[in-house]
C-alpha cells in the first residue's frame, strides 16, 4: 500500500505549473517534502489530501482514487493538517481533538471515540491542558493540539503542511520527536512539508525534493544529503558535514 501520483498536474497560469508529477510514497515511516519556496510542496500535499483539485493525472491512497472516492471513505484512511487553521478560540483542547473523530462519529461521539480522543491527547502530552481554551495556550501547545486532532482521526496516512511554522527550536524538536513516535509506535505513515533540511534528514526515512513544480530527487536522507544535490535543489551553496548525530547541511 502506498500513496501514488501519476502524471499529476496543477496549472495556475501559462507560466506557473506544478507537475506533471509521478512518484510513489511507500507506506510506513516519515517522508519529508523539501525544496525552495514555490517549489510546489504544499500544493502536492493538499492535492493528495483532496483539499485542492488536480487538473490532470491520478492520485491513489491505499489503492483508493482520491478524486473519485467518497469523502467519507478517504477521511477514514487519510488526515490532513494545513498550514493555516481557523478554529474558534473558545474551544478547549479536548473539543478540538474531538473534531478528529467527525468522519467516524458525524458529531455524535461514542465511548470508542472518546477513547481515541484521550489516547491522542495523552500521546501529545496534553492531558494537563485538555480543558484549557485554545487562546490560553502557547503557540507550541496549540500546534500539538492540532496534531492530536489529526491523530485522533486514526488514519493510516497523516499529511502535515509545515507544522513547525512559528515554533521555536525547543518546540520544533519536540514536535518532530512526537511525529517520529507516531510513525514508529502507532504505525502511521507521516508525510510532512518541512523547510529545514536538517530536520528532514534527522527524522525522516525518505526525502522527496521538489523544485520548480517538479520532483527532482526522491531517496533516503543519505542520498539527498550530498553537497551537489542540495546545492542544486536550493540554488545556494550547501556543504554537508558529519555532525554528532548524522549529516548536517551548512549553508550560512
Give the ranges of each region predicted by the language model.
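ABC ATPase nucleotide-binding domains
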Residues: 233-252
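Helix-to-loop junction immediately C-terminal to a conserved catalytic motif
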Residues: 49
Amino acid at each position: 500500500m502506498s500513496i501514488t501520483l501519476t502524471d499529476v498536474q496543477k496549472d495556475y497560469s501559462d507560466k506557473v505549473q506544478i507537475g506533471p508529477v509521478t512518484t510513489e510514497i511507500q507506506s510506513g515511516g516519515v517522508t519529508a517534502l523539501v525544496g525552495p519556496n514555490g517549489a510546489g510542496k504544499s500544493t502536492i500535499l493538499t492535492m493528495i489530501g483532496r483539499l485542492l483539485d488536480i487538473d490532470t493525472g491520478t492520485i491513489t491512497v491505499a489503492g483508493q482514487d482520491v478524486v473519485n472516492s467518497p469523502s467519507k471513505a478517504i477521511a477514514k484512511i487519510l488526515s490532513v493538517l494545513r498550514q493555516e487553521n481557523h478554529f474558534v478560540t473558545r474551544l478547549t483542547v479536548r473539543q478540538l481533538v474531538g473534531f478528529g473523530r467527525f468522519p467516524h462519529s458525524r458529531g455524535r461521539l461514542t465511548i470508542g471515540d472518546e477513547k481515541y480522543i484521550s489516547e491522542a491527547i495523552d500521546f501529545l502530552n496534553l492531558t494537563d491542558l485538555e480543558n484549557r481554551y485554545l487562546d490560553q495556550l502557547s503557540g507550541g501547545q496549540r500546534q500539538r493540539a492540532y496534531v492530536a486532532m489529526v491523530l485522533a482521526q486514526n488514519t493510516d496516512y497523516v499529511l502535515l503542511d509545515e507544522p513547525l511554522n512559528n515554533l521555536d527550536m525547543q518546540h520544533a524538536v519536540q514536535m518532530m520527536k512526537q511525529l517520529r513516535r507516531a510513525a514508529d509506535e502507532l504505525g502511521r505513515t507521516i508525510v510532512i512539508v518541512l523547510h529545514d533540511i536538517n530536520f528532514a534528514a534527522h527524522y525522516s526515512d525518505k526525502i522527496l525534493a521538489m523544485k520548480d513544480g517538479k520532483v527532482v530527487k526522491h531517496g533516503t536522507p543519505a542520498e539527498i544529503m550530498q553537497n551537489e544535490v542540495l546545492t542544486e535543489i536550493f540554488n545556494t551553496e550547501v556543504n554537508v558535514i558529519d555532525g554528532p548525530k548524522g549529516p548536517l547541511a551548512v549553508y550560512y
